[in-house]
């Protein structure tokens, strides 16, 4: 071995041994622009890509806790857990799918409901968790939604729901389809009593959820570029055998065609919802914007 080979060999071995392994989960790739992002920075930015502003999917519990005032959250119907009444089995047993989803997410089911305050205004909030079996709606989702709506009715306070779902849970068959009617019925009761219901549609909101509670808000809001519809675009294209328009079923397309009321950036969601709740309950705005302060001055 020559002197240069000895030096190069020593250098390469020392550099490789000095390399430290990067812990798993430190970096995340944006699902839109594919930019590699520091995970902690992404969390601070509420899972919105700082490079392209893509709104990535957001954990349901984190979403609700970041929406409500600090230390004000009280979970509603946390004890409810899905049961395999039909002993359903496809490629896997339903109970095995539930166990796997519960282990992966740390949640009992795909829907979380809470009571708390938003800028000191009492509200009831709920969110689907897409990571739990695609945010599918089963019996527990319907029961939790009704319990949350009943709390809003009892306290005469607004109800805000974030949707992120592939639709009804097929493993519960007709029991899951019944939840469409069940949730729609309690929302009709809320409307009769004049209790505000604000629906926030996030990516994706599809199937039986979009065909029931998600589109029944007194105000329907969407996050940017959220996929919203009944069947997905691929299924529609295969059925009609035509190419769909650019951006079909995205939030911007729906806003342009009058299917939703507004699109709100995630960073602005908390203040926007607070203003809407104040307006809809005939209460003063819970905080002053910079524009209002300038006008008053």
Swiss-Prot record:
InterPro entries, sorted: AcCoA_carboxyl_beta, Acetyl_CoA_COase_Trfase_b_su, ClpP/crotonase-like_dom_sf, COA_CT_N, Znf-ACC
GO BP terms: fatty acid biosynthetic process; malonyl-CoA biosynthetic process
Pathways per UniProt: Lipid metabolism; malonyl-CoA biosynthesis; malonyl-CoA from acetyl-CoA: step 1/1
Every CoA carboxyltransferase N-terminal domain range: 26-295
PROSITE patterns: COA_CT_NTER
EC nos: 2.1.3.15
Main location: cytoplasm
Region annotation Disordered: where it falls in the sequence: 1-23
Zinc finger residue ranges, C4-type: 30-52
Catalytic activity entry: N(6)-carboxybiotinyl-L-lysyl-[protein] + acetyl-CoA = N(6)-biotinyl-L-lysyl-[protein] + malonyl-CoA
NCBIfam families on file: accD (TIGR00515)
Function noted in UniProt: Component of the acetyl coenzyme A carboxylase (ACC) complex. Biotin carboxylase (BC) catalyzes the carboxylation of biotin on its carrier protein (BCCP) and then the CO(2) group is transferred by the transcarboxylase to acetyl-CoA to form malonyl-CoA.
Descriptive protein name: Acetyl-coenzyme A carboxylase carboxyl transferase subunit beta
Species per Swiss-Prot/TrEMBL record: Actinobacillus pleuropneumoniae serotype 3 (strain JL03)
Lineage of producing organism: Bacteria, Pseudomonadati, Pseudomonadota, Gammaproteobacteria, Pasteurellales
Gene encoding the protein: accD
């Amino acid at each position: 071995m020559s002197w240069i080979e000895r030096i190069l060999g020593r250098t390469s071995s020392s550099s490789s041994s000095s390399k430290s392994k990067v812990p798993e989960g430190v970096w995340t790739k944006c699902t839109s622009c594919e930019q590699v992002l520091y995970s902690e920075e992404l969390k601070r930015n509420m899972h919105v890509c700082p490079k392209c502003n893509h709104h990535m999917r957001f954990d349901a519990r984190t979403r609700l806790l970041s929406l409500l005032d600090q230390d004000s959250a009280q979970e509603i119907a946390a004890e409810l857990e899905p049961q395999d009444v039909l002993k359903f089995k496809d490629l896997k047993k339903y109970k095995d799918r539930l166990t796997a989803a519960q282990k992966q997410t740390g949640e009992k089911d795909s829907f979380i409901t809470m009571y708390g305050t938003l800028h000191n205004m009492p509200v009831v909030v709920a969110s689907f968790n897409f990571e739990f079996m695609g945010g599918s709606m089963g019996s527990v989702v319907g029961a939790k939604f009704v319990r949350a709506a009943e709390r809003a009715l009892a306290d005469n306070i607004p109800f805000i729901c974030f949707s992120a779902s592939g639709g009804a849970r097929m493993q519960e068959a007709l029991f899951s389809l019944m939840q469409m009617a069940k949730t729609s019925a309690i929302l009709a009761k809320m409307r009769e009593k004049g209790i505000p219901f604000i629906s926030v549609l996030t990516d994706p909101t599809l199937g039986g959820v979009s065909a029931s509670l998600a589109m029944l808000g007194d105000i329907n809001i969407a996050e940017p570029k959220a996929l919203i519809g009944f069947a997905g675009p691929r299924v529609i294209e295969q059925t009609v055998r035509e190419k769909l328009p650019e951006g079909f079923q995205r939030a911007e397309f729906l806003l342009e065609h009058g299917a939703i009321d507004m699109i709100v950036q995630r960073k602005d969601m908390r203040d926007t919802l607070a203003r809407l709740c104040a307006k809809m309950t005939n209460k003063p705005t819970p905080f002053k914007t910079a524009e209002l302060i300038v006008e008053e001055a």
